[in-house]
Amino acid sequence: MKKMLAALLSALTLLTCGIFSDCTAEKRQPDTDAVWETLSEAYIYAFPLVLTDATKTLSTNTDGSMAGRAPVNQFNHAKKLADASFRTVVTPNVDTVYSQAWLDIGAEPLVYVLPETDRFCNVQILDAWTNTAAVLDKAGVYAIALPDWEGELPDGVTRVNVPTASVWSIARVVLSGDEDLPHVYAIQEQMQLLPLSAYGQEERYTVPQGRYVKENDFVPVNKVLSMTPGEFFNTANTLMQANPPADADRELLEKLSAIRVGAGMTFDDSLLGEDAAERWAQMLQGLRATLSADSAKYAQKLGQWRYYGKPIGDFGTAYTYRAMVALVGLGANTVDVAIYPKTAVDETGAALRGEKTYTLHFASLPPTRAGGFWSVTAYGADDFLIDNPIHRYCINDRSAFELNEDGTLDLVLSRNAPENTANWLPVSDGGFHLFLRIYVPDMEALDAWQPPVIREQQEI
């Protein structure tokens, strides 16, 4: 027995001394360089979880009277498309109207009713770690539940398992302009969201009143980036209790436990050394560059365009990629639902400038599967939509553009209007960039597809 105890103590000593120097019985001095290396891994790992929670806190911070927000387990239905005055989210989508809801399925499943529609309408179900747990793309009645929930569902209700108690649902409904909004409103009115215990007796169900807290009015990413190490990691540790990490994370979590990062733990900031504040600030300042460099391998090339490919939206152990996408595009779709190629240069590699006039030439239109669609949207250097006299922010497959006789398509990108504005996409005075959004893309056909080319028009 004594030999067994000695062996166990020896093993524990080796385990805990991995990030400590001078590991003696009397005193352990932290090896701060090793601690900070592990800390950086922990931050990248937990960043999407903490940012998602901050976004939820802001989005549900309402007593029910604030546009653009809704209490937990209730819909926030957008009522119009973004325009040049919109400044809430960068590079806003002007193809679909959103109906979002933040769900808490810890106590019981939530029932989501998706009506029949005559158009693209799907619901992305994300877990607390920003992975897409499911996509609801057919009309039906769904029960969003934790995997270990053991109750019975009524007939006709389809179970959808999500591994975390906190769930973000994003419904996207395509429309053809403002004149089409009444049809979208009709779809929104038929959507339902309620606890399973209230399903079938909706007339007795009273929607809970939300609550507004002034301190929770913040910009989520700024809130997270302003946290101290203790605030950040203790928030993450608490969130992991209701939103457990995936089994595939076990190896990393064993490593992170040495600095007290894990479900239910209390972070020990005494390990960080005397210059902790300075090193923390330096780490955060270099975060975007670190994430971008480490995630570059996931960027897919499409001519002069680039987009982020697999495993976006279903990240597995690609922790750095997951953190980068959370930072620049929280709630990204998987590639089978949509891809978002971007370019800021013409065919020569020169930066796009509004002082010039360009032709965006499609040899053929973007390949999509049944129900798919596409759009080209212009954004200014500030990543927002560009103000223009005809209030046109994109050209899409629903637009009244004119094809060439050979079936190709030429769009005009310019600051000033051409004589024929049918194919004109207005741009800004200075620099600008484009997003080519392809929804329900045909990924096999995409490999052989010739992407559009941007050519500067030469003055004659």
Regions found by a protein language model. Give the residues of each.
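Bacterial Sec-dependent signal peptides at the C-terminal "C-region" and cleavage site
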Residues: 12-29
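Bacterial N-terminal signal peptides that target proteins for export
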Residues: 1-8
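A periodicity- and composition-biased signal for non-globular, repetitive helical segments
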Residues: 8-9, 443
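A compositional/structural signature for long, glycine/proline-rich flexible linkers
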Residues: 26-460
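Intrinsic disorder/low-complexity segments
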Residues: 7, 17-21, 449
